[in-house]
Amino acid sequence: MENRKIDGNYVAKADERFMGMITGNVTVKSGVKFINHGMICENVIVEENGFFYNHGMVNGNIMGEGYAEVWGVVKGYLSSMLNTYVHQEAVVNGERYEFDEKSI
C-alpha cells in the first residue's frame, strides 16, 4: 500500500486498499471492495453490491446503495439508502459514536 495523491474524481473498479489523498469524488463500483486509510476530499458513492470501508477521513458524504463501514471520520452524512455500520469512536457529521453496555 503506497501513499499517493489522485487529483480529481476516482472510480474504484477493482478491490483496493488506499492510502493518500483523492481530491474529488470516489465511486465504488458494484462487486468492488475499497478500503480507505487516507483522505477523500469530496463524496463517496457506493454502487449496489459495492463495499466501502473507511479508516481515514471523508470530507463529504457517503451515499449510494451499497455497504459502508466507518471506523474513521465522515464530515458529512451517511445516506439512509446505504447498508451501514459505524464503529465505536468513529465520527460522523460531527458526532462521535459511543456505545455503553445498555445499547449493545
Regions inferred by a protein language model and the residue ranges of each:
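Extended beta-solenoid/beta-helix repeat architectures
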Residues: 1-104
